Amino acid sequence: PTDSSYALVCHLDDKTAVDRLRRIRQVDDRHHLTLLCADLSEVANYAKVDNQQYRLLKLATPGAFTFILDASKEVPRRVSHPSRKSIGLRVPDHPVIHALLAAHGEPLLATTLILPGETDPLNDAAEIREQLPNDLAGIIDAGACASTPTTVIDLTPMRTGEAPEILREGGGDWTRLGL
C-alpha cells in the first residue's frame, strides 16, 4: 500500500522479481518502473539531480508524485529506460510503505498494481489475492487505500533549460509546484 494505490514491489537487484513485475503488468522494458525512496537523500543516490530539480522535489515530497530523472550509475541497467537511461522515483507518504522501506534499508522497485486491460489500480488486499493467487510472494494488507495513480512528471527536460513535462495527472496536485 502507498499513498496512491497498492503497488507491486521488489528488491532492486532481484532480476527474477523485476521480470515478474513486468510479466504481471504485461509491460516491456520501455515502461518506467519506479524506485520508492524513504527520503530525498536516497533519490540523490539513484538519480542525477540539479538544484532546480531538487527544489521541485523538495516541494512535492513526500506525496503522490513520480518524477522521471536521469538515472545514476547506481541504477541497474535492466531497470532504467533503455533508450533514455532514466528512472522513475518517488517518496511516498504512507506509514506502511515507510515502515517497509525502513525495514529493508534501501529503495524498493515498484509499479502501480494495475492489471492488464484495466485502467484503475487494485486497492484491496483480498481482491489482489483473488486476482493474483500464485504470482506474489506476499501481500501486505493495510486495508483499502487510495486508488488514484501518482502524478508523473518528467524532469529530464530541465537539464536543457526546458520545462518539466506532465506525463500523467494523478493524485499529486502539480499546480502547487508552480508548473
Regions found by a protein language model. Name each.
Residues 1-179:
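Active-site-adjacent structural elements in enzyme catalytic cores
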